[in-house]
Structures are given as C-alpha cells and as structure tokens.
From Swiss-Prot:
Organism (species): Simian virus 41
Ranges where the record places region Ntail: 405-543
UniProt lineage: Viruses, Riboviria, Orthornavirae, Negarnaviricota, Haploviricotina
Protein name: Nucleoprotein
Polar residues composition-biased segments: 503-517
Gene: N
Subcellular location per the Swiss-Prot or TrEMBL entry: Virion; Host cytoplasm
GO molecular function: RNA binding; structural molecule activity
C-alpha cells in the first residue's frame, strides 16, 4: 500500500511539471501587427514634455486604433530613459507585435504635428493624420484635456525638473491602474484613490498633474488590450527588483507599485499556504486533506519551476494561472479561509466566497483557529528555551485577551463595557443595554470551548437576539439574590460639559464594579474563572 501512495505522490508532482519538458513543441508564430513608436534622441525637456502630452492624447483619442494606442503607451513608458531607442528594445522581445521606431526632432510650434527625422519614411499625410487623431478628444473629458487642471498642456517645461515631475506623475497613475487591469478592471474607484493618496503623500505624484478618472479608465483599458505593453511592463518590473538600495527615482517608484502587481490573481493559493499550511495545526492530519496536500506540494514545485516571471502570470495573461485556482484544492482552501477570517483582520477585504467554498470545512477552520490561538509551536519554543510554565502562562494570557474581546475570537463590541467575556445582552425590556450574570453561573472558563458550553452560548445568543432574555427571576435579581442594577450606559445630554460627563461615567463604572463584586461574593458555586476572582472586576471591565 505504501508503494501505491508514493507512486501517487510522484504522479501528482510529475503531472504538474510535465509541461516544462525540453521537448515541448514551440508554438507557431502568428501574424503580428505593426506598431509605430515615436522616439527622440534629445534630452530637451520641452520636447519630451510635448511628446508625453502627444502620446497621452493619442491614447485618449476616439479615432485611434489599438496599434496607435499601443505605440503611444510604449513611447510614454520609455520617456524617462536617456536613450529611448535602446530602451524600447525590451518591447521587441515580445512575440505579440513588430515595433517600428520613428525618430522625431520636434513639433511644429505648439501644435501636435510631429516633425519626423530626415531618415524617416513617414509621409506628410501620416503626419497630418496623427495630428487629427491627437485633436479628437472624447466629450467625456472635461475641457478637452486629460488632466483635471486645464492649464497643464499650456505650461512651459523648459527645465528638466519640471518635465520629470510631469512625467513621473503621469506614469505613476498609469502604473496604479495597471495593478488590477487584468484581475479586477471594474473595481470601485476607491481602491485607486487610496493608492493615489498614498503616492501624493509620498511626493511621487504632483496634485497639479492629476488625470481625470475617465482618462485613467481609458489608459487601463488600453493596457488591458495591449499584451505587448504588458510584456514591456513586466521587464520594467524585473529591472526594478534590484538587490541594491541605490536606485533612480523612477525605478524606485516602479518597484514600490510592483508589490501590488506581484502574485495578482493568486491570492487564494498563497492564502491557503499561509493559513492552511503555515499554521501547522493538527487538523491537517485529517484524511480528507491528504490528497489536496499532495496537490499543494506539486503546485509549490510547479511555481518554483516557472522562474522569476511566475509573479506576473496574471499580467502576462498566462494560462498556467489556472493551475493554481483554489477549485483544485477546495477543502484546504475552505479550511484556510476559516482560519484567516479569525486571525487576520485584513481578510475582511478578501472576497473568499466562491461556489466551491465548503461551509463545513470553513467552519472547521474557524473553530480550529479559535481553539488553537493559544497553542505554542514546539520547535520555536525549544529554540527560545521556553519552559512548560512559560508555555502555560503564554496560553493563559492569550486566552484572557481573547475572552476580553468578546470570547472565542469574536470581534469587540462597540460598547466599551460589553467585553465581559461576551456576557452582553443586546437590550433590556426598557430599551437599555445591560449585562446578565445570572445566566453564566455554571461557566467554567478552563473548559471554555467544550461542546456543551458552546451550545449554551448559542442558546443564550439566540434568546438575546429574539429579545426574550432569560428567566424573569434571574433578570430581576443578580447572582446570589442581589438586587438588580440598571446597567444602561449614561448618555451625554446637550450642553453637558466634559467634566460633568466624565464624572457621570466614573460614577457609573464604580457602581458596575461594586455590583459585580457583590455578585461574585454571593455566587453559590464559584463559577467564575480564577483570573476574575483574583482581580475583581478589573479583568472584565477594562476601561
């Protein structure tokens, strides 16, 4: 039997790696469009600024073909290079298009009519056609300009610093819309605005050169449709991943925004590795996971064999991205997502709800994370020289913090006084919020996660949601027959000063603590945890 399992493991790995054998046939060369790219050999900032604005208008134009927009994008992304012609050789590596570099010496006056080099084969009719394309700006752009400020195109950029400020600001906005151009092109604008605000705060985008949202959308669609541009951007990203800390300003910005592009479209795979395998919790020993664990092992080897370009599979539109889809390992994915929702607040923004999400294994991950949050990794503990007492103390500390935030991994409630081990009852009969201690007499926090008590929690929460509360006798009396107390939080009345409101809150907290201590003294079975008994109400009412 063991030989069969070993053969199955080798078969699974080989199945993922067989596409990379040396005898794989080379695909046939397809028909490639001719893309004309305008370049300048001069470092004149005014000329380069005019070429940038010209390329930007070609991308925006209503009458421009896809090849026109692709050439304008390549020219625009090459403007920071001192030798544009040499830099464009990166684009010639792409099997998608043929590049025709056209050198220009300037523009006629303040117009967008290019002046080709004497060696160029560009005709006068083509020059006039490009000028007409640049002037055909869509009506959806305000003031017939891509920029929010209408006077940007009329500005003078005679100094190198002014041109670089304009160039870097425009290119950074193009890089920002590239981040999700393949995986989520219709994402809400708020995600783009957050990154825009980040780079404005860092001084990498000048607010004067902000593009209109419609202009950014057009640029994103143009990049999405032009594979040769995405190939070129991938080479740029690889050059930006320099091992040295000394880099020019442009590639430092490219390397920073490239972190949003890396592993795009592979969030499910890496989250499964991080939360499912990285935690190394005993639940992985389930027999149902054995086959998918072999699959994940094969996929990790498969990813390593793809080389440094594997990080940009979504940007490159690679079919190999489908190999890493979570549908290939649904149980491990569901289990990992359950863990992630408990231990990582960032998972709230991740849309993990898929048709292949298994609810049972998702809940298994949730319960495992709640129970194992105080677990200690034995190998790390051994490296740190932790004793058994240290492990117990660490687990107890984490358990106390978890209970103080609502119990069993729940998020803290809005009411700052609602953290007493989740003993929060939504509303009393009179509409005031209150705490019910009588329902928790039999609570034993040493066995906090027992199935019996979990059922008690569910019953308690269900009754609280339905507004029925518990037994009237318990609702009217505290623990040990103590008289009831109004636990409604004081509200700040209009015109009340800060000192008066603070005094009311202090008095309220003192009454709550006093009532809670009296309730503990009258408890018949001592059903509260040792930490609360030792510290009074301070452990549960942490103000």
């Amino acid at each position: 039997m063991s030989s069969v399992l070993k053969t199955f493991e080798r078969f699974t790995i080989q199945q993922e790696l067989q596409d990379h054998e040396e005898d794989t046939p080379v695909p046939l060369e397809t028909i490639r469009p001719l893309i004309r790219v305008f370049v300048v050999n001069s470092n004149d900032p005014a000329l380069r600024a005019q070429l940038l604005l010209f390329n930007l208008r070609i991308i925006m134009s209503n009458t421009a073909r896809e090849s026109h927009k692709t050439g304008a994008l390549l020219s625009m992304f090459s403007l920071p290079a001192a030798a544009m012609g040499n830099h464009l050789k990166l684009a010639t590596r792409s099997p998608e298009a043929s590049i025709d570099r056209v050198e220009i010496t300037g523009f006629e006056g303040r117009s967008f009519r290019v002046v080709p080099d004497a060696r160029s084969t560009m005709s006068r009719a083509e020059v006039l056609a490009y000028e007409a394309i640049a002037e055909d700006i869509p009506d959806t752009l305000n003031h017939k300009t891509p920029f929010v400020n209408a006077d940007v195109e009329q500005g003078d950029y005679d100094e190198t610093e002014g041109f670089l400020e304009l160039c870097y600001s425009v290119l950074m906005q193009a890089w920002i819309v590239t981040c999700k151009c393949m995986t989520a092109p219709d994402q809400p604008p708020i995600s783009i605005e957050k990154r825009m605000a980040k780079y404005q705060q860092q001084g990498r985008i000048n607010p004067r050169f902000i593009l209109q949202p419609e202009a950014r959308r057009i640029i994103q669609n143009a990049i999405r449709k032009a594979m040769v541009v995405r190939h070129f951007l991938t080479y740029e990203l690889q050059m930006a991943q320099s091992k040295t800390l000394l880099a020019n300003r442009y590639y430092a910005m490219v390397g920073d925004v490239g972190k949003y592009i890396e592993h795009s479209g592979m969030g499910g795979f890496f989250c499964t590795l991080k939360y499912g395998l990285g935690t190394r919790w005993p639940t992985l020993a389930l027999a149902a996971f054995s086959g998918e664990l072999q699959k994940l092992k094969a996929l990790m080897l498969h990813y390593q064999s793809l080389g440094p370009m594997a990080k940009y599979m979504a940007l490159l539109e690679s079919p190999k991205l489908m190999d890493f889809a979570p549908a290939e390992y649904p149980l491990m994915y569901s289990y990992a997502m359950g863990i992630g929702t408990v231990i990582d607040t960032n998972m709230r923004n991740y849309a993990y709800g898929r048709s292949y999400l298994n609810p049972q294994y998702f809940q298994l991950g949730v319960e495992t994370a709640r129970k194992q949050q105080g677990a200690v990794d034995h190998r790390t503990a051994e490296d740190l020289g932790m004793s058994q007492a240290d492990k117990v103390e660490l687990a107890a500390t984490l358990a106390k913090l978890t209970i103080g935030q609502g119990g069993r991994g729940r998020q803290p409630l809005d009411d700052p006084f609602a953290g007493a081990a989740g003993d929060y009852q939504g509303a009393a009969a009179g509409g005031a919020q209150g705490f019910d201690y009588a329902s928790r007499r039999v609570r034993k926090y040493n066995d906090y996660e027992s199935d019996e008590e979990a059922g008690m929690d569910d019953d308690y929460e269900q009754e609280a949601r339905e507004g029925r509360g518990y037994d009237d006798d318990d609702a009217r009396q505290g623990i040990g027959g103590q008289s009831g107390f109004d636990f409604s939080v004081p509200q700040r009345a209009p015109g009340m000063s800060d000192e008066e409101f603070q005094a009311q809150m202090t008095k309220y907290i003192q009454h709550v603590q006093q009532h809670y201590q009296e309730a503990q003294e009258g408890a018949e079975d001592g059903g509260y945890n040792q930490t609360t008994d030792d510290q009074g109400a301070g452990g549960d009412f942490d103000t």
